[in-house]
Amino acid sequence: MNIAFFNDIRNEILNQISSAKEEINIAMAWFTNQDLLDALNSKLKENVMVNLIILDDEINRNDIYGLDFVSFINNGGNFYLSSISDKFLHHKFCIIDSKIIITGSYNWTNYAEYRNDENIIISDDQYVVLLYK
């Protein structure tokens, strides 16, 4: 399966998150979408391991756009901030159960969902998944 999505991306990601049984690994430059964080918190309560790394910048930390990741951590999520340096985290991918990769231009933000033209590709090609691990 190699499928590209240009519309209704958040719901496609939510569908993939809901299918996770063991582990979700996410590297995301910007993450401000509460629905996606809620889905990750739900998976943590089902004992799915969730690892999340995001960029340590103003968008992810401010009171207007930023999310409260304390609940994620309290539910057992592994949370990491990537510092801004000469080479900063600009990835946008998620690996589900080491079997499915979701990648593309879509940050997990409200802007990506409601204001930008974005895309993702969902693939179960194991060679591609391994490249991202």
Range-by-range predicted roles:
Residues 28:
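Glycine-rich anion-binding loop/nest that anchors nucleotide
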Residues 1-19, 31-133:
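HKD-type phospholipase D/PLD-like phosphodiesterase module
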